[in-house]
Design a protein with these regions (language model features):
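Conserved ASCE/P-loop NTPase catalytic core
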Residues: 1-201, 206-218, 226-243, 247-289, ...
Length: 362
């Protein structure tokens, strides 16, 4: 079984995220329904990098080089179509991703020093002819950037504009053709805010989601999840799990999802378990003893508040009777979640029955 995990397919993403991959194919392979795509996915660098890597596997670069070559001659700037990848505004990386952007990073800039003018490309130039993946959080915080980007994608033309309205560009710069597909990623709240700001575009854009969990229906599905964890360990350059360590990780995954038949596909959760367990690993694989040590240390590290509740019971500041019997009184376990605390814990509560005369109304 361990050998099967090590010799898994290059990528399981297509099998574990079929809806998302179908949406990517609609955007990239088939005639585009819309140049924009919305994806519900955590706005973290690890997820954006994963999405960029999977998009590269589906994206087919154009037969001809995209972009132009800007020639600066004193105060005059001209452009010609790009002939080599070394041209200053030729597109060499068809898929670009960023979780936060500034105007200069997205659209490039014009620099002038000692009378010499230079043009610096931005993300839209490097992704010309391909795909640009951006975080909705960054665009919602800077609506002017979004309006300019949307306009350029719709018109298929990049216009050089000054970021400071009080200081125009020192020279006139010819516009360049732009062929770009944009994937906007965000959590549910960001998508809702974007839909309110752009209702028509949201209705026309291709939509899909990253599925956080995997329903374990049979042994094959469980094997796929184990292969997914193994591939994440290889990408992070961390040791894999030994055969006796898998039950503990599966149990912790079920505890995380709250369902014994559901396991997480969250790359951040998987990376955290592997990194913390690797700190105790002394061999080539992470063993069950090292997983258990990691979980016990984490419980102790995060268990201050839970221990204080236990101390109150032991010191009889919180009276919890565990012997004898009493009519109309019983105990329940309340789940306590403190803001900012990573772990929920249980607190016993006494519930007493109170009887009183009613007021005669239903």
């Amino acid at each position: 079984a361990q050998a099967d995990l090590a010799h898994a397919e290059e990528s399981l993403s297509g099998e574990l995220q079929p809806r998302l991959f179908y949406a990517l194919e609609q955007l990239l392979v088939t005639p585009a329904i819309s140049p924009f795509m919305l994806v519900k996915i955590p706005e973290e660098p690890e997820y954006l990098q994963w999405l960029a890597n999977e998009t590269r596997t589906l994206h087919q670069p154009a037969a001809t080089l995209c972009g132009v070559h800007y020639q600066v001659d004193g105060g005059k700037i001209s452009l010609t179509p790009a002939h080599t990848a070394e041209d200053n505004f030729a597109s060499v990386a068809p898929v670009e991703a960023a979780d936060w952007i500034e105007a200069e990073q997205l659209f490039g800039c014009v620099r002038q020093f000692n009378g010499e003018i230079t043009l610096q490309p931005g993300l839209v130039h490097r992704a010309n002819g391909g795909v640009l993946i951006l975080s909705l959080r960054a665009l919602l915080a800077q609506p002017l950037l979004w309006m300019r980007l949307k306009n350029m994608v719709a018109r298929q033309r990049f216009d050089w504009l000054s970021f400071d309205e009080s200081r125009p560009l020192p020279v006139s710069i010819p516009s360049m053709p732009l062929s770009l597909k944009v994937i906007l990623v965000g959590e549910r709240e960001s998508l809702a805010d974007f839909q309110e700001m752009e209702p028509e575009l949201s209705a026309q854009a291709i939509y899909s989601e990253y599925e956080d969990n995997l329903q374990i229906a049979d042994a094959d599905t469980l094997k796929q999840w184990c292969q997914w964890v193994w591939q994440n360990a290889q990408q992070l350059e961390l040791p894999g799990l030994s055969a006796n360590a898998w039950p503990l990780l599966i149990q912790e995954g079920a505890r995380y999802t709250g369902d014994q038949e559901t396991l997480p596909l969250c790359v951040l959760w998987i990376a955290r378990q592997l990194r913390e367990a690797a700190a105790f690993c002394e061999g080539e694989e992470i063993r069950a003893e090292e997983i258990q040590t990691m979980l016990e240390r984490r419980l102790w590290r995060e268990g201050y508040l839970a221990e204080r509740i236990q101390d109150e019971i032991l010191q009889e500041q919180l009276l919890i009777e565990t012997v004898g019997e009493c009519v109309g009184q019983f105990y329940a376990l309340s789940v306590i979640e403190f803001p900012g605390h990573p772990r929920a814990f249980g607190e016993p509560s006494r519930i007493s029955c109170v009887v009183h005369i009613g007021d005669g109304e239903f």
